[in-house]
């Protein structure tokens, strides 16, 4: 069973989607499911609580049930993103090297763009090789905000 619920946050409206007890989507984009119940569940409520703590500077890691849905390559990239510590960044090239596919820099960028679990799977922590902010599916202004919040952008 799919449940989803939208909250207002400092980044605007954020929708959380849960399937069978695990989060599958966290997005700031409009979310229109084919099926599902618009209902706040314990998992969704906990995800919002942890995200609120993150926004207020009280949380650096998330402890939530996640179900990553994507290609094997995408899931490999997203698993690598989960290992980037709070307050640190990595380049797309570094992620490609981490997953053992150093020539897949553009593919890493595409996997980042398809990340369904914003913030919790921290694709915002991936920057260009030159240290510049590039590519964030929901806007570079939000990426900059998140990196400043984490202290990795001064």
Language-model segments: residues:
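Low-complexity, small/basic-enriched stretches
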Residues: 1-62, 131-154
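Short helix/strand-capping hinge loops at secondary-structure junctions
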Residues: 84-87
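Short amphipathic alpha-helical boundary/capping segments
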Residues: 64-70
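Short, leucine-enriched amphipathic alpha-helices that occur as contiguous helical runs
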Residues: 70, 74-78, 105
């Amino acid at each position: 069973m799919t449940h989803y619920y939208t909250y207002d946050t400092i980044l605007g409206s954020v929708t959380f989607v849960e399937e069978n007890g695990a989060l599958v989507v966290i997005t700031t984009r409009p979310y229109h499911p084919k099926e599902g119940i618009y209902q706040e569940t314990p998992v969704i409520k906990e995800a919002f609580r942890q995200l609120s703590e993150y926004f207020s500077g009280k949380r650096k890691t998330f402890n939530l049930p996640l179900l990553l849905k994507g290609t094997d390559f995408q899931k490999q990239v997203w698993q690598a993103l989960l290992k980037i510590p709070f307050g640190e960044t990595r380049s797309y090239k570094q992620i490609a090297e981490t997953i053992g596919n150093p020539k897949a820099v553009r593919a890493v960028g595409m996997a980042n763009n398809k990340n369904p679990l914003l913030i919790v799977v921290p694709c915002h922590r991936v920057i260009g090789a030159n240290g510049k902010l590039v590519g964030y599916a929901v806007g570079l202004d939000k990426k900059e905000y998140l990196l400043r919040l984490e202290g990795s952008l001064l």
